[in-house]
């Protein structure tokens, strides 16, 4: 069974995809596939960040501290 990559590993993978696409030297079909993969990674990374924020909010609230979250 494959282990899930860390946030940092997934972020690096997204950065690699972006660099590859920005180079403009990728065939169209590959560029489309890489773009789709990048979008999935981006959404996954965003979800991870949102979950981390929720966890921190819970920890802070459990501590009795007041917090203010801006959306």
UniProtKB/Swiss-Prot annotation:
Class in the EC hierarchy, top level: hydrolase
InterPro entries the UniProt entry points to: Exonuc_VII_S, Exonuc_VII_ssu_sf
Gene3D superfamilies for this protein: Exonuclease VII, small subunit
Subcellular location field: Cytoplasm
Cellular component terms (Gene Ontology): cytosol; exodeoxyribonuclease VII complex
EC number(s) on file: 3.1.11.6
An annotated Gene Ontology molecular function: exodeoxyribonuclease VII activity
One Pfam family in the UniProt entry: Exonuc_VII_S
SUPFAM superfamilies: XseB-like
Keywords: Cytoplasm, Exonuclease, Hydrolase, Nuclease
Source organism, top-level taxon: Bacteria
Complexes and interactors: Heterooligomer composed of large and small subunits.
Protein known as: Exodeoxyribonuclease 7 small subunit
Organism name: Streptococcus uberis (strain ATCC BAA-854 / 0140J)
């Amino acid at each position: 069974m494959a282990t899930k990559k860390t946030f940092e590993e997934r972020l690096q993978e997204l950065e690699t995809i972006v660099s590859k696409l920005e180079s403009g030297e990728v065939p169209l079909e590959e560029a489309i596939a890489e773009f789709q993969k990048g979008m999935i990674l981006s959404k996954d990374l965003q979800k991870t960040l949102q979950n981390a924020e929720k966890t921190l909010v819970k920890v802070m609230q459990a501590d009795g501290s007041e917090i203010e979250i801006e959306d």
